[in-house]
Amino acid sequence: MNRFLIFCLPLLLPFSIVAQDNKEKPAVTYEELYDEPYSVNKLFIGFQPLYGELFATNANAGFGVEASYYYKDKLDFKAHFRKTYSSNFFDFNRQAALDNSDLDFTNKPQIFNYFELGGTYHIKDFDGAGKTKMVLYKKSLRGNKWAANVPLRAEVPCKVRKIYGVRLGGIHWKSTVDLNRALKEQGLTNADLVNNNGEGLLPINPITGAVRNVGVFSNLSTTNIYIGGSAAWFRNVAVSFEKYEEGLDDGLLTLFFDVIFAPGLTLDPVTYLGQDYSTNAVKTSSFGFRAGIDGKFNRTMSWSYGGEVGIRPSIAGQGFYMMFKIAFPVFGTNLDYKVESFGK
């Protein structure tokens, strides 16, 4: 009998914990303060102190600036710029060109920079019934007490604004390119880079007369057009909990997918000893796609996040990229500065 009890106790323990846990979770009451998913800021401007891009053409990281504008329930626009802080942090190919390029090559390594401007037309913009989960917080649980506590969450019904849209925009970016790697991946050599006389790029060692193994770099510039679709979910709800601090959910989340085409893609010739050597032998790809996420909050000052993954028009076989970005601070405003005035 004792052995049977010893065997059963471990099995009954989880049920006891669950029962105790449920007992310690009383229902909470709340009062709705507002639930207005259409009452969001019109303009958001954010500084991005850090972004990172794992790009097959050129891995890079740096800073950026981003702005979003919402025009009623019809359109929204987005502008974005980012660049590397320096070649050391972090512009991989540019730093490699500065470290390894021969003095006889006069191409100036290009700083990675990226510009984007686009808009979204709201095909369908509506709200519906939804739910959100809010953390129950007490001021008495500040500091170490809060860190040691497993927070409770309350499920609150709310309105959810849903936006299905069509996206259209343009992208322009520039970067240094490692031609040695591109040539090797495409089964080519420096001899395939030819000047006006049809002579290949074969630097000769004046002492030994042998062909020198040199680092060859160029600059790539692309102008892209993208078209795609997006889905967004906006919440803007606040409630007052009994015995807890107020709860808030003002998240603005957007998912998108774009097809990208580059009508303008230029790979600069290599300049060696004053002569230009054509890069036409290097294959490029003008098509790509991306999927991404953008998130921010409907506040006067907050932060935002985003990420993308896809194939970018670039050197053939070097288009894959993954990117993340974080913005802080992000300033939001509804651009409504009017006040009523009355004569005495």
Model-identified regions with their sequence ranges:
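Glycine- and aromatic-enriched membrane insertion/assembly motifs of diderm outer-membrane
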Residues: 58-126, 224-226, 233, 259
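Residues that define the transmembrane beta-barrel architecture of outer-membrane proteins
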Residues: 41-43, 57-63, 109-117, 162, ...
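Repeated loop/turn-to-beta-strand initiation elements of outer-membrane beta-barrel proteins
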Residues: 73-79, 125-130, 238-239, 297-306, ...
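Outer-membrane beta-barrel "beta-signal"
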Residues: 116-129, 318-344
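Short glycine/proline- and aromatic-enriched beta-strand/turn motifs that initiate or cap beta-hairpins
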Residues: 20-86, 90, 173-177, 329-331, ...
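Outer-membrane beta-barrel transmembrane domain signature
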Residues: 171-306, 311-317
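Outer-membrane beta-barrel biogenesis signature
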Residues: 19-44, 128-159, 241-250, 333-344
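Transmembrane beta-barrel strands of outer-membrane/channel proteins
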Residues: 43-51, 63-69, 79-85, 162-174, ...
